[in-house]
């Protein structure tokens, strides 16, 4: 029972069936309601043990499709791979779209394109950044936003051709017809970057008018819109007295200089370029030009046809020239006088040759004849120059009948100095002294003799020319002057703050004079004087060492070996006694360097051999212990001087190197060796 009343009978006994969703009056049987919708929230348990609300909308990329381990395990396995891909794609699209300043509608459209690419597996094997950039550029093309593919390439630092390849693939696979880009979309953007100031709108409108004219003349199809925009903006800026250089326009529209100049050249070939500024702003030509590619093809075809016609005419002219040349050669052959003497013999020899010889042999024969004729002609010419008279020639040449023809008889009269008009010049050259050199030690003044005053006046600029040249120089070096001015201002500011550091002038390196020496030793000595190898070497001691080693007396080989050995043994005994009496001296001798030269070494070897011989009856000497020097060897010149005086008083031979190094004590005193 409910509080509702039946509209048919007025009864209140109404039965509600929640399963069928209807309300029926039990009195009259009329159906009061059917398909009753319950507004309460119901939950359904799924197969995994989780619960979900009934009637809740779950999107394709929503969180409702996340798998779980069931109600007993509250551990989430995470999203599917495709859900993660879509989420990352949305994040990257919003990031790039914010940098390009795209609205939310464009971003949603780009994300829909990305979902279509993911569903068709177009992202496999391609970087996500490339696919996202292609989707954004698809939106820019379809929505008509002033963005270029080069902008996305700059943001991603990717080659523009790689992005273009991905864009074409997506457009083909997704069946999206991207419309052609209208260059007029980029004019306001580029005009704002070129900073035209108050005339920005006027320059933009003029550039748009130029672009419309280019589109009518078929310059738009197949061309990048940035190149057309750059050419239109450059012309519009010049029309409104703005000096925008080609480099400035290139830096804004992102095209190379050759492309911009090519667009200007193509526009120059149209009839619109022949109009003045006022005529262009008022008149619209109805006729359209042919596309530049078609015009270039027709020009190439005409050039090829013209080359063919010229080649045919050239062949005809060459045939006529060859016929004329043959006729001239025949006439010259007939008018040539008969040769005598050596030339006649040569002609007879040539006529006696076989007529069936090859053309190459005939050419060789003609060359030989010409050489022989030239040699005879040169002889006659030299004789005329030397002034030989006919009498002397006759006396010098007894066989005058066999003399060949003169040069005049063959070639006619030769040109003389008078006929050439150079006789005066030759006379001046002969009369002027050739050996007097010109005085080169002048007083610094220019020799202007022979130069006209008008020519000198042309070298000097007047005021207007100097002013124009100065303006040209200032315009060409404006950037350098601006940099110098900024540099001076920066230096002045640093000087005021006290942080300026003056650069020390570079010292000029003087070239050392070469070492002049007659021997290698002298050169080394001079080199050591200029630059010492080490500051720890006493070079004076080295000089004394060289003088002592070079001046040591040689051994007397004529002395009997027994006497020499006796003296050396006595010297050894005396030295042993002295060393045993003064152990400090022995230790000092051990530390002394080897000061003797090569002869002293040889003497030490000889003494060692004599001491080791059994005939003398001396005891065998034990092998000396190895000395290890732990530092620099001290040198005592006073002790060496005392020893040298003592040796001179005894009148005995020089002390050997073994004795100077304390070799007589090696292996004998164990106490001294313990110190090393």
From Swiss-Prot:
Pfam families: BRF1 (PF07741), TFIIB (PF00382), Zn_Ribbon_TF (PF08271). A zinc finger (TFIIB-type) spans 2-33. InterPro entries: BRF1_TBP-bd_dom, Cyclin-like_dom, Cyclin-like_sf, TFIIB, TFIIB_cyclin, Znf_TFIIB. Sequence repeats lie at residues 91-172, 185-269. Residues 342-371, 386-408, 425-449, 543-603, 617-653 are annotated as: Disordered. It is found in: Nucleus. Belongs to the TFIIB family. This is Transcription factor IIIB 90 kDa subunit. The lineage of its organism: Eukaryota, Metazoa, Chordata, Craniata, Vertebrata.
């Amino acid at each position: 029972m409910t509080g509702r009343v039946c509209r048919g009978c007025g009864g209140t006994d109404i039965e509600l069936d929640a399963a069928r969703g209807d309300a029926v009056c039990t009195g009259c049987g009329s159906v009061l309601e059917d398909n009753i919708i319950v507004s309460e929230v119901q939950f359904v348990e799924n197969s995994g043990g989780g619960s979900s609300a009934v009637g809740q909308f779950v999107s394709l990329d929503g969180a409702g499709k996340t798998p779980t381990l069931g109600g007993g395990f509250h551990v989430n396995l995470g999203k599917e791979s495709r859900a993660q891909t879509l989420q990352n794609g949305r994040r990257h699209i919003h990031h790039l779209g914010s940098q390009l300043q795209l609205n939310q509608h464009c971003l949603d459209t780009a994300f829909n394109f990305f979902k279509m690419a993911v569903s068709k597996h177009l992202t496999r094997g391609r970087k996500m950044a490339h696919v996202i950039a292609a989707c954004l550029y698809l939106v820019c093309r379809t929505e008509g936003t002033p963005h270029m593919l080069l902008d996305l390439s700059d943001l991603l630092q990717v080659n523009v051709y790689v992005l273009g390849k991905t864009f074409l693939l997506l457009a083909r696979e997704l069946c999206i017809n991207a419309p052609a880009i209208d260059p007029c979309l980029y004019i306001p953007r580029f005009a704002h970057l070129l900073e035209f100031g108050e005339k920005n709108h006027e320059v933009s409108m003029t550039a748009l008018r130029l672009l419309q004219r280019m589109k009518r003349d078929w310059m738009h199809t197949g061309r990048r819109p940035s190149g057309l925009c750059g050419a239109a903006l450059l012309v519009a800026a010049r029309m409104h007295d703005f000096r925008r250089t080609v480099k400035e326009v290139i830096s804004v529209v992102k095209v190379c200089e050759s492309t911009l100049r090519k667009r200007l050249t193509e526009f120059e070939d149209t009839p619109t370029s022949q109009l003045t500024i006022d005529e262009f702003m008022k008149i619209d030509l109805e006729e359209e030009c042919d596309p530049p590619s078609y015009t270039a093809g027709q020009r190439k075809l005409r050039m090829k046809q013209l080359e063919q016609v010229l080649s045919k005419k050239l062949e005809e002219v060459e045939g006529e020239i060859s016929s004329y040349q043959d006729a001239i050669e025949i006439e010259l052959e007939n008018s040539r006088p008969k040769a005598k003497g050596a030339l006649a013999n040569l002609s007879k020899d040539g006529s006696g040759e076989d007529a069936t010889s090859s053309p190459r042999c005939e050419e060789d024969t003609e060359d030989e004849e010409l050489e022989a004729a030239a040699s005879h002609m040169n002889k006659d010419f030299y004789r005329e120059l030397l002034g030989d008279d006919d009498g002397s020639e006759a006396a010098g040449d007894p066989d005058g009948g066999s003399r060949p023809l003169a040069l005049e008889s063959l070639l006619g009269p030769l040109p003389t100095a008078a006929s050439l008009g150079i006789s005066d010049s030759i006379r001046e050259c002969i009369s002027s002294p050739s050996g007097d050199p010109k005085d080169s030690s002048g007083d610094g003044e220019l020799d202007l003799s022979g130069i006209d005053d008008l020519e000198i006046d042309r070298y000097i600029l007047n005021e207007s020319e100097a002013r124009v040249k100065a303006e040209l120089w200032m315009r060409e070096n404006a950037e350098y002057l601006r940099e110098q001015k900024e540099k001076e201002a920066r230096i002045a500011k640093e000087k005021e703050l006290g942080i300026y550091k003056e650069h020390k002038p570079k010292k000029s390196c003087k070239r050392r004079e070469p070492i002049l020496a007659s021997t290698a030793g002298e050169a080394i000595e001079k080199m050591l004087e200029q630059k010492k190898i080490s500051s720890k070497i006493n070079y004076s001691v080295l000089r004394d060492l060289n003088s002592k080693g070079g001046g040591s007396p040689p051994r007397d080989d004529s002395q009997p070996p027994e006497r020499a050995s006796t003296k050396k043994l006595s010297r050894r005994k005396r030295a042993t006694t002295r060393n045993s009496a003064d152990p400090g001296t022995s230790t000092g001798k051990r530390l002394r360097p080897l000061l003797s030269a090569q002869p002293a070494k040889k003497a030490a070897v000889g003494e060692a051999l004599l001491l080791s011989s059994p005939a003398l009856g001396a005891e065998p000497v034990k092998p000396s212990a190895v000395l290890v020097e732990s530092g620099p060897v001290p040198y005592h010149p006073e002790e060496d001087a005392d020893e040298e005086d003592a040796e001179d008083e005894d009148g005995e031979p020089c002390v050997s190197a073994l004795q100077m190094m304390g070799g007589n004590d090696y292996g004998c005193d164990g106490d001294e060796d313990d110190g090393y």
